[in-house]
A protein has these predicted regions:
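Noncatalytic, solvent-exposed loop/strand surfaces
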Residues: 1-181
Length: 181
């Protein structure tokens, strides 16, 4: 081990690497936080997004989703519903709260889905009891580009999904594969 560092609180996301930065989500002082470290283990920056919604389990976290980058911008999503876009040096460009905007999270366990990127959008799948949907937001502005509801009935306790969608090319077009009941 070349170096290790403590996070402000339990974070369960997978770190992402972009050039000389290691980027991770974590709660910090009751807030949703995105932070970056250099290869030397020193913190480069830390940006607060909004109030944290803590994990249900003692080992859980409101920061389970992993951040993602297209090499131009960064994006992060949290259990609180906060979805945000950032510059590569951590400056907050925009944020929206999906739970305030659409519906409260009804997942039995803590959130597990992370955002994915298409050519133009940052996309999230929210699959739980009640209104479930796939929503796409403009990467630069955070404006809602489209939202598709899950339009079929699901058995009780089988309507939750914790999986991250996958963007694929299908007959020369982008398609989004979503796992869920």
């Amino acid at each position: 081990v070349k170096w290790k560092t403590a996070l402000p609180a339990k974070g369960c996301s997978t770190p992402i690497v972009w050039k000389d930065q290691i980027i991770i989500t974590s709660p910090s002082d009751g807030n949703d936080t995105l932070m970056a470290f250099g290869w030397d283990g020193k913190k480069r920056w830390q940006t607060t997004v909004g109030s944290e919604r803590a994990g249900k389990h003692r080992n859980g976290s409101g920061s389970n989703p992993s951040a993602i980058t297209d090499g131009k911008l960064l994006f992060a999503y949290f259990k609180s519903g906060n979805l945000a876009g950032f510059t590569l040096d951590g400056k907050l460009l925009w944020k929206t709260n999906l739970q305030d905007r659409f519906a409260r999270d009804t997942l039995y366990w803590d959130i597990g889905t992370s955002p994915v990127l298409t050519a133009k959008h940052v996309v999230l799948a929210v699959m739980h009891s009640g209104e479930s949907y796939l929503a796409a937001f403009d990467k630069r502005t955070g404006e809602l580009a489209w939202k598709e509801s899950r339009n079929y009935k699901t058995p009780v306790e089988c309507d939750h999904s914790y999986a991250t969608p996958h963007v694929v090319q299908y007959h020369g077009r982008e398609a989004i594969v979503v796992w869920g009941a």
